[in-house]
Structures are given as structure tokens and as C-alpha cells.
């Protein structure tokens, strides 16, 4: 539904699957090879890299948005498409000290000043995607690190651009409300009006008030939403705005 009536020249979809089971609606978008992955393991980065390699074959692809199967859109396609700037990648960044002790071994290869941690659910531009698939030293740096998917890309960009990193990326902070990130997630202890008290919230239901709040917030996407949550998401105001992109729709 999200891509209904959208010009197909404006997007491509690439799906890396954990299990090779037929997808009812998206089977044609599965990538040609499966990279076996484990939770919080460097193998996830290898799978992401393979998707990037596939996506880079299309010269018209300017940005690469990583999503999980539990993501939902919180803005219309055209809004997201028009608000991505070609020169930037987008990251939701943690405090650098949060890298330790998970990536202590990386200090064998690089200086502490380059270490960074960010949400896996970043948006890479073409320039940075090409850099990351053509220079994969970070796979060695973080091969034994927990949650390497949160370390590799942002650290390598920090290592490459140094003090000029801020000119290459648009970053939001873990210390900010989570709805300012490009992909929202509700973690325990965050500065959020509807904060969970149980680590990462897996939504089986969302109140209308919270859904409206997220639609009005800067975030493009949100996670983690279980399939059953669709019952509380598929409301007219959500579908009119996010799917139909009704101009001037008043849901505020």
C-alpha cells in the first residue's frame, strides 16, 4: 500500500532474508544470496554490505535506507523522498563512551577518537555506500565486537572524515527524544512522552494519541511493530496521510 501510485523509477527494494520462505507480496525483491546472520554479530554488517552492492548497481539510487521487518512508515513516500539531501547520510548517534567495552579490540587498529556508535537503522547516501563497500577494514576492527552493526559504518566514516564528519552526515543524538531520529524506536529510559519501562518496546498496540504524536514528529519510520499492531495503526487518519498522502489532511 505504501508504494501505491508511486513512480517506480523513484525507488527500489532489496530484501535480505534470514529464511528462504516465499514472501506473499515482496518475493521479487529478495537479493540473490543469503548471508547467514546472528544477532548482534558482524555477519549482519556483511549482509548489509551485500545489499548495498546489489543496490549500487542501479546508478539512479541516491540513498539506501535500512529497514527491518518490524518497521512502519510514519511519513508519506514523497515526504521522505523530498527531504533526503543527496550530500548527506543520516545517523542516530550514541555517546562515544558507549562503544566500550564492546569494541575494545578495535583500539588495536584505530585511535579511540574515531570510535562511534549509532543505530543500525541509518540512511546512507551513494558516496558513503561506495566508500563502505570498497573499504572493509572495519570488518576486521569489529569482528569480535557485540552489535558491530552499530559500530562499523559510523566509525569508518569518522575515521575517514575526522573533524569534518559533521559536513558529511546529519546526526541526531541518543540523548534526544527518539522521535527526532529518522527511524523511531521506543527504548526504556529515553526522553519520550510514551517511554516504555521494558527495554525495547515491541508494539502489539499503539494508542491513537501516540500514533498521532509520531506522525507529527520528525521521524520517517518507526519500529518495532508486531503484525497484530496493524489493527491499531490502520486508521483512516493514518492511511490518508501516510499511504494516500492527502494534501492538507488535518490529523493534528
Question: At which residue positions do the language-model features occur?
Answer:
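ER/Golgi luminal nucleotide-sugar-dependent glycosyltransferases, focusing on the catalytic module
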Residues: 1-252
